A protein has these predicted regions:
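Positively charged, small/polar-rich N-terminal and surface patches that mediate targeting and assembly
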Residues: 1-99
Length: 99
């Protein structure tokens, strides 16, 4: 089992939801207006010069197939996003148990 966080600019929320649909994923938890700064990116603080914010999607996968489909879809979407700092990020961790 795997645990995934998908982090993206809120500008790309509709696109990320399309990627989820295409991968057959209709289960997630989403946090909007997340603030922070990634490696090599500008801050997303929701105010001032850094008025943009991120969304964070959390997904628990029991099966690898939809996760692999999502990874492929994100890689393809990122190839179309010109600025590397704007790309959709996916962080994968092992998941020991779901109750």
């Amino acid at each position: 089992m795997k645990f995934v966080f998908v982090v993206h600019s809120e500008h790309y929320t509709a696109r990320v939801m399309q990627l989820f649909d295409a991968a057959g994923i209709d289960y997630y938890t989403r946090w909007d207006q997340a603030q922070g700064k990634g490696h090599g990116t500008e801050p997303h603080l929701g105010r001032g010069s850094y008025s943009s914010t991120n969304s964070v999607m959390m997904i628990a996968f029991q099966d690898e197939a939809p996760l692999e489909a999502l990874i492929r879809a994100i890689m393809a979407a990122n190839a179309e996003i010109k600025r590397a700092a704007d790309r959709i990020r996916l962080f994968q961790l092992p998941l020991e148990r779901m109750v």
